[in-house]
């Protein structure tokens, strides 16, 4: 039976962990002390998720600054940039501190990306757990800096390097016994959003070509990963998530048939927490054998969703895809960026996960 409930990956960092990380940055504690604080926080998060009964747990991404940081720390050839960028919150545009890495030299892996996280989970999780990684198509598009390093003459050439690095990492994770690997790609939402496509064109990048190059990189990775151990593979199509703000809007329909049909994944995690995500009609393109995990629960607002409303939306979705191929989750992480946590209290975070479990029992039990 497929997993009926999960969350995207990140959880709100507890105060003690945030303090330990500040102390480490200031030189007041050593790496071993920080690691102990991380371990304690992860164990507490596992206990909380177990108590709720969610089908798949994570370590909350507590050891990361954001969803890309593990990769960036594990390779050479990148420089970090911090800048102000325009995000959206409600009907307003807001300025959010963002960061990105740019390629400035040969990208080679020098350390594990997530294997240390996975080993701790393998020793301490009592139910299936997942490990999240940024997708190669996304990081190649975002990290490419034209003209800074000649051997990477194009995004596609850089993507080949990240496909190889992430493929090696996933093989190591599978050997460690990781049951579920999720790729995160906020880049696909660019191609749903007219304004984002216009900005991409203004930079001299053809949006349709960029989409197909991104898709080709992610497909190349997913076609190379080990399948013999029954590992679950998923893609999360993110619309941006930082301090309760977001970046992209639009229906999935313009890319759904090609996107959903091209990637050999077991699960597609799709954001559906408000009207900017469009309707469920695109679910007709989800291939047989793939589960659509509907992100109906918002990590951006404190209000805990009503099971009745969630049941209604699951019913609406089942008009386009068999109900047995649905699952339920929040739309994105609760703290994709450790310093840009969403405006949700920890109690509300876990209440939202509990509502997901309750709703799933009511919708799926007996089917």
Description of each model-found segment:
Residues 1-367:
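Domain-level signal for soluble alpha/beta catalytic cores
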């Amino acid at each position: 039976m497929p997993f009926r409930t999960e969350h995207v990956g990140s959880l709100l960092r507890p105060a003690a962990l945030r303090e330990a990380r500040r102390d480490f940055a200031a030189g007041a504690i050593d790496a071993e002390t920080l690691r102990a604080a991380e371990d304690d926080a992860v164990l507490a998060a596992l206990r909380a998720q177990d108590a709720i009964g969610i089908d798949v747990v994570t370590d909350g991404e507590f050891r990361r600054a954001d969803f890309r940081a593990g990769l960036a720390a594990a390779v050479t050839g990148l420089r970090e940039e911090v800048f102000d960028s325009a995000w959206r919150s409600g009907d307003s545009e807001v300025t959010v501190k963002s960061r990105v890495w740019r390629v400035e030299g040969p990208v080679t892996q020098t350390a594990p990306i997530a294997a240390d996280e996975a080993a701790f989970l393998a020793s301490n999780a009592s139910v299936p757990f997942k490990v999240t990684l940024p997708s190669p198509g996304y990081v190649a598009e975002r990290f490419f800096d034209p003209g800074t390093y000649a051997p990477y003459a194009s995004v596609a050439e850089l993507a080949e390097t990240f496909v190889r690095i992430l493929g090696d990492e996933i093989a190591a994770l599978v050997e460690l016994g990781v049951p579920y690997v999720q790729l995160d790609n906020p880049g696909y939402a660019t191609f749903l959003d007219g304004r984002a496509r216009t900005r991409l064109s203004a930079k001299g990048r053809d949006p349709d070509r960029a989409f197909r190059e991104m898709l080709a990189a992610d497909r190349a990775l997913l076609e190379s990963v080990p399948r013999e151990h029954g590992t679950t593979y998923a893609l999360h199509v993110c619309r941006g998530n930082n301090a309760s703000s977001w970046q992209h809007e639009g229906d999935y329909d313009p890319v759904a048939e090609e996107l959903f049909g091209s990637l050999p994944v077991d699960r597609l995690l799709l954001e559906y927490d408000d009207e900017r995500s469009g309707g469920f009609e695109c679910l007709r393109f989800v291939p047989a054998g793939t589960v659509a995990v509907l992100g109906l629960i918002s990590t951006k607002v404190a209000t805990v969703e009503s099971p009745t409303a969630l049941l209604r939306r699951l019913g609406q979705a089942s008009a386009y895809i068999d109900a047995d191929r649905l699952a339920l989750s929040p739309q994105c992480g609760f703290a994709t960026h450790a310093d840009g946590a969403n405006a949700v209290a920890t109690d509300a975070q876990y209440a939202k996960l509990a509502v997901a479990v309750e709703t799933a029992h009511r919708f799926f039990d007996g089917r």
